[in-house]
């Protein structure tokens, strides 16, 4: 689900933190991609002309494999080295959100049964799309045969993507979920796995610029995201994005906001704090997520296993052999040329903390004063 209204807040208050670029701008970059989110996109977007999912002669869905194969090739063609990260076991705190999703599925199934037009049927069918265990396993098999590394995260894929970026294993995390910023990835790439026909630029969000622009610590930013609405718990009823930002900037933490509301000082009877609100547990899931230490992960891109890849996609899944062989040639060529990398890829760029930035600003101010005094002394001697 991500964070409700966060993109709008960043766009309004810190537009400089979002850079829109063509895919070619990321030549030589390694990127950790939220695989579960990508598969969901492929199942929705990769369709037949009649709007139905792609299937082979046996009736098996192949939209996810078609999307994974060709979108990965597009990245490789443009010199990007992708690594995919799959979701592990969801945190217990997410169970309420998963229950809500199940309830919505039941409601959607009812609407589908009542639909009278093809357009309405298609709309409801897309809402029922769900990434299954089989979809994940088939995608992992495909990536293994393509020579593309993948990781199964202990819990949330976005958290593991951010960990790889923080440890310098990749340049950025790629996901449509804005909650990836809560894990303090240096950079978040959105729309990376979109179809080329959409002509949608890639949005690169700089987390440190977001924090500085909003004048928030990472802890306050996470509290803001919980206030806006995340997958782990409810938010304060009656508080919208504008008010949530104002409350965090005024009071500094959810604890202080709760005190402010419960004391009656807010004079707002519409604000309702959820009972037994687990915001502290939600906060820790963002600030200290369960991940595999990025330093222990060695990402390796290997030549594709041509024979096995053709057997899997063409013999088993009934893909066009001519197109698959063409794709394999692109894959081999792209992985070879992508080895060149970028000059800045030889250096690990460590994002500065707020404290480091403040210290640097103080030093700059002191140097300015020192130079000013030197100029005064020089003028006096004249």
UniProtKB/Swiss-Prot annotation:
The keyword Isomerase appears for this protein: no
Amino acids binding Mg(2+) 2: 177, 179, 231
Cofactors that this protein relies on: Mg(2+)
Region called I-domain, residue ranges: 120-251
Compartments in which it is found: Nucleus, Nucleolus; Nucleus, Nucleoplasm; Mitochondrion
Alphabetical list of SUPFAM superfamilies matching this protein: 5' to 3' exonuclease, C-terminal subdomain, PIN domain-like
Region of interest (Interaction with PCNA), residue spans: 339-347
Protein name stated in the entry: Flap endonuclease 1
Species of the source: Saccharomyces cerevisiae (strain RM11-1a)
UniProt lineage: Eukaryota, Fungi, Dikarya, Ascomycota, Saccharomycotina
